[in-house]
């Protein structure tokens, strides 16, 4: 199959990478796993055993008229322990390489079908100026866009840093969530070739 390149000849690409059937269940599983892996998982609360304080019975069992109590660290007391205290945990889910690559291919194929993948010969700017990048995107009629280049262009990265809904990544930095999140994905010809090699 071929991808149309803006202002240049069409680019021949692999059917298995850019013409794959849409697999919603696979993409959902991989996206959920990716989001789960991004969770910090460091929350920690103290149980009644871990709260600092005396273990002495606050008052005798009978005769005071007050409710019976055996421990100031009881969960029903103010500043007591938490009944089911949250502990640090690893939320990451295992995703096989084959599944991950399959999901990326499926997303790229769907982007092609929806005309959301824009292939350009090169995407460069002369200076790290946001104004220059805004004008370049306006010329291509692009707003909400992910720009993927073969290697990270510092000028491009710095210019896009302050723009809302514009992100710049190299091929190694792409992930299923960012590919889905943007309305358009701009890819250079060299990046397309690298993606094909990476997903082969």
Curated annotation (Swiss-Prot):
Annotated region (Disordered), positions in chain: 43-71
Keywords: Ribonucleoprotein, Ribosomal protein, RNA-binding, rRNA-binding
Cellular-component GO terms for this entry: ribonucleoprotein complex; ribosome
BP terms from Gene Ontology: translation
Top-level taxon in the UniProt lineage: Bacteria
Molecular function per GO: rRNA binding; structural constituent of ribosome
Family annotation (InterPro entries): Ribosomal_uL4 (IPR002136), Ribosomal_uL4-like (IPR013005), Ribosomal_uL4_dom_sf (IPR023574)
The keyword S-adenosyl-L-methionine is assigned to this record: no
Record-linked Gene3D superfamilies: 3.40.1370.10
Subunit structure: Part of the 50S ribosomal subunit.
UniProt function note: One of the primary rRNA binding proteins, this protein initially binds near the 5'-end of the 23S rRNA. It is important during the early stages of 50S assembly. It makes multiple contacts with different domains of the 23S rRNA in the assembled 50S subunit and ribosome.
Family: Belongs to the universal ribosomal protein uL4 family.
Protein name as catalogued: Large ribosomal subunit protein uL4
């Amino acid at each position: 199959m071929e991808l149309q390149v803006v202002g240049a000849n069409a680019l021949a690409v692999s059917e298995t990478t850019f013409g794959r059937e849409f697999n919603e269940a696979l993409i959902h599983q991989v996206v959920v796993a990716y989001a789960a892996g991004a969770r910090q998982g460091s929350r920690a609360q103290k149980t009644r055993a871990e709260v600092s304080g005396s273990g002495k019975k606050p008052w005798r069992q009978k005769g005071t008229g007050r409710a019976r109590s055996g421990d100031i660290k009881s969960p029903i007391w103010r500043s007591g322990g938490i009944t089911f205290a949250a502990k640090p945990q690893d939320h990451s889910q295992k995703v096989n390489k084959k599944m991950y690559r399959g999901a990326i291919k499926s997303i790229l194929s769907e982007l092609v079908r929806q005309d959301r993948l824009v292939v350009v010969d090169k995407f460069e700017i002369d200076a790290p100026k946001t104004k220059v990048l805004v004008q370049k995107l306006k010329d291509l009629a692009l707003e909400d866009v992910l720009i993927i280049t073969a290697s990270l262009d510092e000028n491009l990265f710095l210019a896009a840093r302050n723009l809302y809904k514009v992100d710049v990544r190299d091929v190694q930095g792409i992930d299923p969530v960012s590919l889905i999140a943007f309305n358009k994905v701009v890819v250079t010809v060299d990046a397309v070739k690298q993606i094909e090699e990476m997903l082969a």
